[in-house]
Amino acid sequence: MTDTSLQSNTALENETTHFGFTTVAKEEKVTKVAEVFHSVAAKYDIMNDLMSGGIHRLWKRFTIDCSGARPGQRILDLGGGTGDLTAKFSRIVGDQGHVVLADINNSMLNVGRDKLRDNGIVGNVHYVQANAEELPFPDDYFDVITISFCLRNVTDKDKALRSMFRVLKPGGRLLVLEFSKPVLEPLSKVYDAYSFHLLPKMGELVANDAESYRYLAESIRMHPDQETLEGMMQDAGFENTKYYNLTGGIVALHRGYKF
């Protein structure tokens, strides 16, 4: 292979990424992911309960417990969607604290805003439409950042992690809650069957959208495994990194600090 061919292939790789199992231009992924979440926003909470049997609430509770959130702190719930974590953080930080619910998708953000306001959660929560790769916040601003079931949808994950590191205060912590790789082979086989066959059918029946939930299954398989993601966090500058496998590694919570 010539140097010119190598350069051409490298340039192509730099301009493309994965949307599920499909290779697409980076700009196209942003559009396609947006379409997925515009489509599922209204049924997002219902589908989360159905898909996980409600276990997602335990995963999120563990994330809150590991956050170390305290009254008066500033917290960023990035890719916070319908606001499950924001609701909990709002109560913890109190009137002197501040929670930002940020999401790139305005449909998800609107659903989250409406849900939280309907539940009387106002005053210390602000809503920002933002791209995780280019966060519109000052340096060293947040005490805690969480990103829950969102990172796998981000086009440039390394850039997003660097952006999170920038806006986190020294001494602050990042928590990444995301689908991961099952650690037990029998569980992995059952999980594959469930993900690729039952999830799209559930999506079709409940949300009238099988394709978005097929993408969900594919995006999980393309997401970095536990060790790889921990390494990416370290490359972005995070220290004292650690991850916890939840439900046999179907989900993992990664934690890292900025010092």
From Swiss-Prot:
S-adenosyl-L-methionine binds at T82, D103, N131, A132, S148. The keyword S-adenosyl-L-methionine applies. Keywords: Menaquinone biosynthesis, Methyltransferase, S-adenosyl-L-methionine, Transferase, Ubiquinone biosynthesis. It comes from the Bacteria. PROSITE patterns: SAM_MT_UBIE (PS51608), UBIE_1 (PS01183), UBIE_2 (PS01184). It catalyses: a 2-demethylmenaquinol + S-adenosyl-L-methionine = a menaquinol + S-adenosyl-L-homocysteine + H(+); a 2-methoxy-6-(all-trans-polyprenyl)benzene-1,4-diol + S-adenosyl-L-methionine = a 5-methoxy-2-methyl-3-(all-trans-polyprenyl)benzene-1,4-diol + S-adenosyl-L-homocysteine + H(+). Its EC number is 2.1.1.163, 2.1.1.201. One of its GO terms (molecular function) is demethylmenaquinone methyltransferase activity. It holds the Pfam family Ubie_methyltran. GO terms for biological process: aerobic respiration; menaquinone biosynthetic process; methylation. CDD domains: AdoMet_MTases. Pathway: Quinol/quinone metabolism; menaquinone biosynthesis; menaquinol from 1,4-dihydroxy-2-naphthoate: step 2/2; Cofactor biosynthesis; ubiquinone biosynthesis. InterPro entries: SAM-dependent_MTases_sf, UbiE/COQ5_MeTrFase, UbiE/COQ5_MeTrFase_CS. Belongs to the class I-like SAM-binding methyltransferase superfamily. MenG/UbiE family. Methyltransferase required for the conversion of demethylmenaquinol (DMKH2) to menaquinol (MKH2) and the conversion of 2-polyprenyl-6-methoxy-1,4-benzoquinol (DDMQH2) to 2-polyprenyl-3-methyl-6-methoxy-1,4-benzoquinol (DMQH2). PANTHER family: 2-METHOXY-6-POLYPRENYL-1,4-BENZOQUINOL METHYLASE, MITOCHONDRIAL (PTHR43591:SF24), METHYLTRANSFERASE (PTHR43591). This is Ubiquinone/menaquinone biosynthesis C-methyltransferase UbiE. It comes from Vibrio parahaemolyticus serotype O3:K6 (strain RIMD 2210633).
